[in-house]
Amino acid sequence: VARQAAKDRRVDLLSFPSDPRKRFFDAAEGELASKALAALEINMASLLSLQGFPRVRLLSRLRWEVEIAKKFKVPLVISSGADNEYLLRAPHDFATLASLFDLPLSSALNSLSEVPQGIVERNRLKLSPSYVAPGVRVIKEGKDCPRV
């Protein structure tokens, strides 16, 4: 399912569970996501709620996935994933936590603000009446531009 989602241009965000055995973001997935303009979500709730060896294993996996994302220029989105108020943190706190998986502070802040904003703007463009297909927009309508 993850491979098919990474190929599909309608998919904006690839999100995986915290269990390392169920995470499938590898080099092939990274290449497909890069071509389809999909971003990789890093859910911080699992990082905050896990303890001991499972947290260490998740951090190791996140380091590996961030390296793959950098290699294939796949944008990262850091999300809180909070399902209660105790998992909420300030954006700068999440950016600092991202240093645990080798993401520089500037990139982490970008993953918290600019990348999600870009996804929202891209989707708003798709919802506009002038949007036809990727790379195709209606520029002018009128008598000299008959509709088919």
What are these language model-derived features?
Residues 1-148:
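Charged catalytic cores and adjacent phosphate/nucleic-acid-binding surfaces used
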